[in-house]
Amino acid sequence: MARYEEVSVSGFEEFHRAVEQHNGKTIFAYFTGSKDAGGKSWCPDCVQAEPVVREGLKHISEGCVFIYCQVGEKPYWKDPNNDFRKNLKVTAVPTLLKYGTPQKLVESECLQANLVEMLFSED
């Protein structure tokens, strides 16, 4: 049995619903460029960071929730008025954050295993 629950969502509305459904739990969210039918993201940094983030999940506390969120296609993401930028202050992908706290890793920080591990293991 997994020590944590993983939820995969696409878009801001699904992300918001997932957060509401897991209210009261510690939530980590990973924001990444959406993948095409072949499973390839338009965001090269996201492709590089994903295995580092996946490895870091070994350090997540029991009972936490990990939300894997695809932010949409590149034109939507680049719009300064998209919901992720306006409502969550997520301004770059990849971004890994502990929801409801100022703790977050942005872009190249998501490639640093020690930082990812630290984010997941802090209480």
Swiss-Prot record:
Keywords: Acetylation, Cytoplasm, Disulfide bond, Redox-active center. The record marks 44-45 as: Contributes to redox potential value. InterPro entries: Thioredoxin-like_sf (IPR036249), TXNDC17-like (IPR045108), TXNDC17_dom (IPR010357). Residues 41-123 form the Thioredoxin domain. GO terms for cellular component: cytosol; extracellular exosome. SUPFAM superfamilies: Thioredoxin-like. The active site is at residues 43, 46. The keyword Acetylation applies. It comes from the Eukaryota. Disulfide bonds join 43-46. Pfam families: TXD17-like_Trx (PF06110). GO terms for biological process: tumor necrosis factor-mediated signaling pathway. The oxidized protein is reduced by TRXR1. Disulfide reductase. May participate in various redox reactions through the reversible oxidation of its active center dithiol to a disulfide and catalyze dithiol-disulfide exchange reactions. Modulates TNF-alpha signaling and NF-kappa-B activation. Has peroxidase activity and may contribute to the elimination of cellular hydrogen peroxide. Interacts with TRXR1 and DYNLL1/DNCL1. This is Thioredoxin domain-containing protein 17.
